[in-house]
From Swiss-Prot:
Belongs to the polyadenylate-binding protein type-1 family. Binds the poly(A) tail of mRNA. Appears to be an important mediator of the multiple roles of the poly(A) tail in mRNA biogenesis, stability and translation. In the nucleus, involved in both mRNA cleavage and polyadenylation. Is also required for efficient mRNA export to the cytoplasm. Acts in concert with a poly(A)-specific nuclease (PAN) to affect poly(A) tail shortening, which may occur concomitantly with either nucleocytoplasmic mRNA transport or translational initiation. It holds the Pfam family MLLE. Residues 1-46, 511-537 are annotated as: Disordered. Residues 537-618 form the PABC domain. It comes from Debaryomyces hansenii (strain ATCC 36239 / CBS 767 / BCRC 21394 / JCM 1990 / NBRC 0083 / IGC 2968). Residues 1-11 have a biased composition (Polar residues). The keyword Transport applies. This is Polyadenylate-binding protein, cytoplasmic and nuclear. NCBIfam families: PABP-1234. Transmembrane segments: none annotated. InterPro entries: Nucleotide-bd_a/b_plait_sf, PABP-dom, PABP_1234, PABP_HYD_C, PABP_RRM1, RBD_domain_sf, RRM2_I_PABPs, RRM_dom. The keyword Repeat applies. It is found in: Cytoplasm; Nucleus.
């Protein structure tokens, strides 16, 4: 390096000595392979024609409009996109800004990089779509043991003296606190080598930093396995608290030459009972582990084993827990039964008595709440699958204390949830196929501002014959609605849910006339409708609907219905207003227009839909509680 370059490096290092108070030291952190911390490793050289920028470290509240205000003064912006989660639609914390001119992109990086956006310093670099170039780590370096006060900008200012930086990042936790390591990606490998040569081992903010080439996760893992097989560092615990460091060393030096030793102590200088010993060669470390592990010293059995990093220990414990859990599950596979619909008087002893005739029971338990009252379900575990199968065959639907039992093999919660999702998906596919065969999806419209409602929104009744029987005093026809022709009542679908008769208006529960008269109703949908009394606003809306495309008509009507439903104050739950709106959108457009004009007619239909929603919610909650 020239004398001028050396002076520039020295100035950058001096600037980095921040005045902030030092914080508690952290463990030496190894290179991580997380997606967030390797973003710097993923960046690469950019072509001269590119004008697309990656903007990271964004506050979740930042949107496209705010970014346009910030970047548009630089030059003409072609497009801006904040990347969001596909399900929750929440910001992922980064965005792409596209300029028409490459020069504008360069200026944006120069002027706006690390500037505050909603209280957070943003990180801007060229977007590189080619994954092979993004993973090219020739110019990427890794820095660890950084001072916690060093941020992205301070790191960038220090290392920019060695060449053009494509990306620079200090790794942080979820709270935005530095993890004391980071990455710098240079445009050329030569610049990276110069940075390593000049900064590695230097003091930055009173800390000696390590600077080296970034190693990919795959290479790190292979190297880590090699280190595990040839370890020299040993961890010992359960050491006598009266042991001094000299005695601790004497305990291990008989097995080989020691390069370093450390006995952990508290703030008063007393031993914490554990420490580390590093041998010169692997054989000495293995010998110490073999001969000292589980050896009794001063009346205590000590543990001696290969020293592990915290992350490795946590992963190992997690694997052990998972293996134990799977072993336990496989042990009870096919022998553990779930029983529900139990009478409140049945306790664990009575439950065991009922199932005892079918085989040897290892455990039986009725689940109770905090007051000791039965929850109405329990578990019985047999010694063999054959006994469990026999119990299911004999006891399922058997009347015990006046209630039919439900008996089946017990399932894990995640398995039950997966099966339920599959059943829902299958029903949705069946409904879509049936709808496609009739040329549309009646009763299913989801405006962008609220949730729609599935057709035939009715809870199953308790009679077991579906929710739409024929002449039944308990079933009513909607006020003013023409009944379907004979034989066109909706048939029950899966789980008792009704499948709507296409081409017929949907049936809602609520304020109905008695259906025992065979469904004879006054013909005509709008008994209170008066065309001459329509207001100017309603005529305008009718004209808009008439001129709007067919696929937009329901959306327009939904935007009129939704605030009217919310204004009633009765749809208190978050999803209630949206679902009720979706139900009412199943009506014909003319009838919806009449509802918007006639408050009395609107209230009648609203109460019907609200009643149906509440009944459905109660049945859903009951089904969830049983499961």
């Amino acid at each position: 390096m020239s004398a001028a370059d050396a002076n520039q490096v020295q100035e950058s290092l001096e600037k980095l000595n921040l005045d902030s108070a030092p914080v508690a030291s952290t463990e030496e952190t190894e290179q991580t392979a997380s997606g967030e911390t390797e973003e710097a490793a993923d960046s690469a050289q950019v072509s001269d024609t590119s004008a697309s920028l990656y903007v990271g470290e964004l506050n979740p509240s930042v949107n496209e409009a705010l970014l346009f205000e910030i970047f548009s003064p630089i030059g003409q912006v072609a497009s801006i996109r904040v990347c969001r989660d596909a399900v929750t639609k929440k910001s992922l914390g980064y965005a792409y800004v596209n300029f028409h001119k490459f020069e504008d992109g360069e200026k944006a990086i120069e002027d706006l990089n690390y500037s505050l956006i909603e209280g957070r310093p943003c990180r801007i670099m060229w977007s590189q779509r080619d994954p092979s170039l993004r993973r090219n780590g020739d110019g990427n370096i890794f820095i660890k043991n950084l001072h916690p006060a060093i941020d992205n900008k301070a790191l960038h200012d220090t290392f920019t003296a060695f060449g053009k930086i494509l990306s620079c990042k200090v790794a942080t936790d979820d709270m935005g606190i530095s993890k004391c390591f980071g990455f710098v990606h240079y445009e050329t490998a030569e610049a990276a080598e110069a940075a390593i040569e000049n900064v590695n081992g230097m003091l930055l903010n009173d800390r000696e930093v390590y600077v080296g080439k970034h190693i990919s996760k795959k290479d790190r893992e292979s190297k880590f396995e090699e280190m595990k097989a040839n370890f020299t560092n040993v961890y010992a615990k359960n050491i006598d608290l009266d042991f001094s460091e000299e005695e601790f060393k004497k305990l291990f030096e008989a097995y080989g030459k020691i390069t370093s030793i450390y006995l952990e102590k508290d703030h008063e200088g007393k031993s914490k009972g554990f420490g580390f010993v590093n041998f010169e060669n692997h054989e000495s470390a293995v010998k110490a582990v073999d001969e000292l592990n589980d050896k009794e010293i001063n009346g205590q059995k000590i543990y001696v084993g290969r020293a592990q990093k915290k992350r490795e220990r946590l992963e190992e414990l997690k694997k052990q827990y998972e293996n134990t859990r799977l072993e336990k599950l496989s042990k009870y596979q096919g022998v553990n039964l779930f029983i529900k619909n139990l009478d409140d008087t049945i306790d664990s002893e009575k439950l065991e008595e009922e199932f005892k005739p079918f085989g040897s029971i290892t455990s039986a338990r009725v689940m109770v709440d905090e007051t000791g009252k039965s929850k109405g379900f329990g578990f019985v575990c047999f010694s063999s699958p054959e006994e469990a199968t026999k119990a299911i065959t004999e006891m399922n639907q058997r009347m015990i204390y006046g209630k039919p039992l439900y008996v089946a093999l017990a399932q894990r919660k995640d398995v039950r949830r997966s099966q339920l999702e599959q059943q829902i998906q299958a029903r949705n596919q069946m409904r879509m196929q049936n709808a496609a065969a009739t040329g549309g999806i009646p009763g299913q419209f989801i405006p962008p501002m609220f949730y729609g409602q599935q057709p035939g929104f009715f809870p199953p009744n308790g009679r077991g014959n579906g929710p739409f029987p024929g002449p039944n005093p308990q079933m009513m026809m909607p006020r003013g609605q023409i009944p379907p022709p004979q034989g066109q009542w909706p048939r029950p679908g899966p789980n008792g849910q009704p499948v709507p008769v296409y081409g017929m208006p949907p049936v809602y529960g609520g304020d109905f006339n008695n259906g025992a008269n065979g469904g004879r109703q006054q013909r005509g949908y709008y008994p209170n409708r008066n065309q001459n009394q329509k207001g100017r606003q309603q005529k305008d809306l009718a004209a808009i609907i008439a001129n709007a495309p067919a696929d937009q008509q329901k959306r327009i009507l939904g935007e009129e219905l939704y605030p009217k439903i919310v204004s009633t104050g009765k749809a208190q739950e978050p999803e209630a207003a949206g679902k009720i709106t979706g139900m009412m959108l199943d009506l014909d457009n003319e009838e919806i227009l009449a509802l918007l004009e006639d408050d009395e007619l609107f209230n009648t239909h609203f109460e019907d839909a609200l009643t149906a929603f509440e009944e459905y919610k109660k049945s859903s909650e009951a089904a969830t509680a049983e499961n």
